[in-house]
């Protein structure tokens, strides 16, 4: 239930406004305190009086109409909200938000918001597929907004396709799940080890070779795991990120050998190990004591294989849940499932690093989770922190099942 949760519903101008009326009613029935902001266009479809009657609060329609002279309306509304839902969100309002435009009560309030913002698009199927709209949605994902994907069906314009505002009862369920997860700690008492970032393999005192990993996915997982109640040890290669707050231990490493040593030192005491680090497969056979000087002609650098840490953990595994990552460029499912089986993993998270919004350094990701029992779960583009929560919820469920069987 949503007892005493403050939900700010922002309604922009589209035919789906009628569904926003039902959403207001269902949120109130679930126990939420609901306030509504309407754009000028939204008021052309439904009277503000309708939302006032359903929410039992006066409706915001004008930035310059200060309902309470002791506060500034758009700041007060933003501070009041525990959750903000923009439904329906038109292409116009999505474009404004993506570009920081604040020219009405809705957009001005969202610029001042610190609560989570969910955007529920509703528009013609071709508008939703337009490159400009997709670009704006991608920007908002990177800014930390969450999206409630539109459903497919008959649209008011006569087309059949993706663009229908999600059903109000489903949005309410998502809100209930959000607040339930916020107050729960499904990983409480669990010892979680997460590896992140690249490794550096020294050639000489000046040079090394590495990879494009930035550590963002691993650090997001560590942050989320702490929030879900876990005791988190983060083992990180060299990155330019701040340590997540609340870690039990932070272990910085440089090379693949360092990473292996650190992981093995904490493995036996762990309940869950998540290996997001991009560990080098090869390292120089000889590390030069002094800087190598330029020479005429070419140069041959002899390499040797590093130890496959994930495979070694799979062989040593007792009751731990072992999670791997697969950053691929082709045949994603084939290589992910092969790695899942070969390394005795419980699940593996795979992505196509060439896809827009899913590569190294991006703040978003598009992943598929493959499970040991053969099923998979595809996630849409979302922030790496949101991806982390989804992954960890799956791990928590798996941990619970494992505990019930043992």
From Swiss-Prot:
Annotated stretches, region: Phosphopantothenoylcysteine decarboxylase: 1-191
Pathway entry: Cofactor biosynthesis; coenzyme A biosynthesis; CoA from (R)-pantothenate: step 2/5; Cofactor biosynthesis; coenzyme A biosynthesis; CoA from (R)-pantothenate: step 3/5
Gene3D superfamilies per UniProt: CoaB-like (3.40.50.10300), Flavin prenyltransferase-like (3.40.50.1950)
Matching InterPro entries: CoaB-like_sf (IPR035929), CoaBC (IPR005252), DNA/pantothenate-metab_flavo_C (IPR007085), Flavin_trans-like (IPR036551), Flavoprotein (IPR003382)
Xref: HAMAP family: CoaBC
Pfam assignment, any one: Flavoprotein
Gene Ontology, cellular component aspect: phosphopantothenoylcysteine decarboxylase complex
Function summary: Catalyzes two sequential steps in the biosynthesis of coenzyme A. In the first step cysteine is conjugated to 4'-phosphopantothenate to form 4-phosphopantothenoylcysteine. In the second step the latter compound is decarboxylated to form 4'-phosphopantotheine.
UniProt keyword annotation of Magnesium present: yes
GO biological process, one term: coenzyme A biosynthetic process
Name of this chain's protein: Coenzyme A biosynthesis bifunctional protein CoaBC
Location of the region described as Phosphopantothenate--cysteine ligase in the Swiss-Prot/TrEMBL record: 192-406
Source organism phylogeny: Bacteria, Bacillati, Bacillota, Bacilli, Bacillales
Keyword Membrane: no
Keyword vocabulary terms for this entry: Decarboxylase, Flavoprotein, FMN, Ligase, Lyase, Magnesium, Metal-binding, Multifunctional enzyme
